[in-house]
Curated annotation (Swiss-Prot):
SUPFAM superfamilies: YjbQ-like (SSF111038). InterPro entries: UPF0047_YjbQ-like, YjbQ-like_sf. This is UPF0047 protein Rv2556c. GO terms for cellular component: peptidoglycan-based cell wall. Belongs to the UPF0047 family. The lineage of its organism: Bacteria, Bacillati, Actinomycetota, Actinomycetes, Mycobacteriales. It comes from Mycobacterium tuberculosis (strain ATCC 25618 / H37Rv). Gene3D superfamilies: YjbQ-like. It comes from the Bacteria.
Length: 133
């Protein structure tokens, strides 16, 4: 298994498009599976359309589902931080994409994005792993 780790700045963005980095990683391979994993308890990875408002809609929906207030038992960190720890239940910490001829088999409008509503951590690691097959 080949692996690489991306260092991602999330200080000013809640949705970070990882698609170009994933494509670049996959070009060194032929056929197999690429896993994109974020090893953090308050972030996730999704496949969505970006640039047409869907990314903002996702953030708005998550903010409505997980309001930042004092209702959470997990109460350390900034106000409402407990909501951040529930995010991975809604947006999984990984996605796996089939790869053929070194290209991720994404649909025309699909992008791989890091989702991070937690403003306490301005940097995130994203692990890319490739399994030949």
């Amino acid at each position: 298994m080949d692996t690489d780790v991306l260092d991602v700045d999330t200080a000013r963005r809640r949705i970070v498009d990882l698609t170009d980095a994933v494509r670049a990683f996959c070009t060194a391979h032929d056929d197999g599976l690429c896993n994109v994993f974020v090893p953090h308890a308050t972030a996730g990875v999704a496949i969505i359309e970006t640039g047409a408002g869907s990314d903002e809609d996702l953030v708005d929906t998550l903010v409505r589902l997980l309001p930042r207030d004092d209702r959470y038992r997990h109460a350390h960190g900034s106000y409402g931080h407990g909501a951040d720890h529930l995010l991975p239940a809604f947006v999984a910490p990984s996605v796996t994409v089939p790869v053929s001829g070194g290209q991720p088999l994404l649909g025309t409008w699909q992008s791989i994005v890091l989702v991070d509503l937690n403003q306490d951590n301005p940097r995130r690691s994203v692990r890319l792993s490739f399994v030949e097959g």
